[in-house]
Design a protein with these regions (language model features):
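Amphipathic alpha-helical polymerization modules
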Residues: 1-153, 175, 291-397
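Cysteine-poor, low-complexity segments in flexible/peripheral regions
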Residues: 142-303
Length: 397
């Protein structure tokens, strides 16, 4: 009796096994060639999801790192410009102090005025400087518009805005890359407090305002203090508010002058008849200080009121220097924050790369062993397939 053998079934089974082994070997070869454990998402869907998520985080980190480089370049340029402005303010203070020198002739003072005028022009050029992209550094968020210009009266006006340009350098931090020129150069704290002085001094007087403050922020009145000789070796004062006498008393240098919320302190030698008018001003513009210093330098060297105003200009230039120095320190602090943020991003990026490597990168020693095992299995399948292919019923007759 003939024995029936399902040769087709055996042939198909061995052929399928051969194909499976061939696919495994090809997969091992592709892994070894690419160095990657996962060649397509279907190899491990969960691992592929994590890899995709990590890649997105790495891409975001790279954007932050690129932003940090850009902001750092802008801030470093900003810091240098502020430092140059500091130097101009300090040099202007020195020149103005020299103008006060009583031994100076009118010609000497005019020579110093010309130097100051040159500094003022250079200062205006500096505050209108542009970065490598053509953006005006001190224009706030209007970088394409020149921020400072002189009007027909010679006063400097501001055409920018009061905001900072910012860029996102992390998910939680937007870093300012500039400071508006209005804040830096036109809103400088008044070194005399809440008021600025106007002097009407007698010959030989050395009287100067030291400080004047008022706790009543709504009091916008102008005050005038006039000093008189009390004929007892002391001075008295008369205080006017908007032209009306509101107080009179013996003057005490230690106590100063007090009226309601107003406090006025002076320094220097008083001459009977000296008068100081004070008007409200919490902040000042360094451009006005340049203009005023040059205007008062035209006065006679013997004009004590003009000399007192030049003293005021030296104090304002010094206050501007302090104000700019603080702004430069703030810019330096931002640069330090950028360095810290950059290091944090790089550390996190390294952690992500390690995590991604665990999911994605090939363990070569393990892969070589697997390739060797699959190659031997393929060889066995090929031998089995060869025998099955040659099998016929005549072998059993």
């Amino acid at each position: 009796m003939l024995t029936r053998i399902s040769s087709f079934h055996n042939y198909q089974s061995v052929q399928n096994d051969l194909r499976r082994q061939e696919n495994k070997v090809h997969h091992n070869q592709e892994q070894l060639a690419s160095g990657k454990k996962l060649l397509k998402p279907s190899d491990d869907p969960l691992a592929s999801y994590y890899i995709q998520n990590i890649s997105q985080q790495q891409e975001q980190l790279q954007q932050y790192l690129s932003s940090i480089v850009l902001v750092r370049n802008r801030l470093e340029n900003h810091e240098v410009n502020i430092a140059n402005a500091e130097n101009f303010a300090d040099e202007s203070k020195r020149l103005t102090m020299e103008m006060i020198n009583g031994a100076f002739s009118a010609e000497d003072r005019q020579a110093k005025k010309r130097e100051l005028e040159e500094i003022a022009n250079n200062f205006l050029n500096l505050v209108n400087s542009q970065d490598e992209s053509g953006n005006y550094v001190f224009a706030g968020t209007k970088p394409k518009s020149q921020p400072f210009y002189r009007d027909k009266d010679g006063s400097v006006q501001y055409a920018g805005d009061d905001y900072q340009r910012k860029m996102k350098v992390s998910s939680m931090l937007e870093m300012p890359m500039n400071d508006p020129g209005s804040k830096l150069f036109m809103e400088i704290p008044n070194p005399f407090g809440d008021y600025q002085p106007n002097y009407d001094l007698q010959n030989g007087s050395e009287l100067l305002l030291n400080r004047a403050t008022n706790v009543d922020t709504k009091d916008d009145a102008e005050y005038r203090v006039t000093f008189v000789d009390m004929n007892n070796g002391k001075f008295g004062y008369q205080l006017e508010r908007n032209g009306k006498v509101v107080d009179a008393d013996e003057f005490s240098p230690e106590k100063g002058i007090e009226y309601k919320g107003l406090k006025v302190h002076v320094k220097g030698q008083i001459t009977p008849g000296d008068s100081i008018e004070i008007e409200k001003r919490a902040e000042f513009s360094i451009f006005d200080t340049f203009k005023d210093a040059m205007a008062w330098s035209d006065k006679s060297v013997s004009d004590t009121s003009a000399t007192a105003k030049l003293h005021q200009m030296t104090e304002e230039f010094h206050a501007a220097f302090i104000h700019l120095n603080k702004a430069r320190t703030d810019a330096g602090a931002r640069l330090s924050t950028l360095d810290i943020q950059e290091q944090n991003h790089e550390d996190f990026n390294l952690s992500l790369a390690k995590a991604k490597s665990n999911f994605e990168d090939l363990d070569y020693s393990k892969a070589v062993i697997e390739f060797s095992e699959n190659s031997r299995a393929l060889q066995a399948s090929q031998q089995a397939f060869g025998k099955t292919k040659d099998l016929t019923l005549f072998n059993y007759i």
